[in-house]
Amino acid sequence: NDLGVVVLGRAASEGVDWEKGDKCDPSEGITNPMQITLKEKAMIKLAKEKCKKVIVIINAVNQMEIQELADDPNIGAILWMGIGANYAPKAVVDIISGATNPSGHLSDIYATSSLSAPAMINYGDYSYTNKDQVIARSKGTGQKYVIEAENIYTGYRYYETRYADYVNNLGNARSNAGSSYTDGNWEYSKEVTYGFGYGLSYTTFSQEIV
């Protein structure tokens, strides 16, 4: 009972996109699939009751909403393992046992709310009004489309760029547009759980530029 390991996961692959409210069981207390379900919360609670230390492993390529885990003082560590095929479990065991030191950094951002990004707001199930004609063409396109109004500002690019604009008071970066909260203006610290490039390790050495 010294250590409890809880694994949270979400399935994903090319061409399999999560939509707002997709595959959500109302009885699980979630409104979008990136949130932690009641069953998962119960599993984490049990681990904390039975074990001295608890580590939560995120086995997903999607960025889940894990602010409550980051705020929980009874969770010793959160480890992202992605979907690493056959060798990933061995690497996780080596990290947990102390055989190797975790030193990776996030390649994308963990937002407090996965629905706050413009790319998510713009996404949807849209079909051309003349889709029957499109399908009839021998070399036609598909019947679905998405207007990517967010341009390059997907993932961390949106949050990091808006933060820079917020600091420099540019545009409407300080407005409540796109905010996950209704108690004030948009704030990076409230919108982001773990920023781009975030990553901790257990090394004891330090480096100094002289």
What are these language model-derived features?
Residues 1-210:
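C-terminal non-catalytic regions of proteins with extracellular/luminal or membrane-system context
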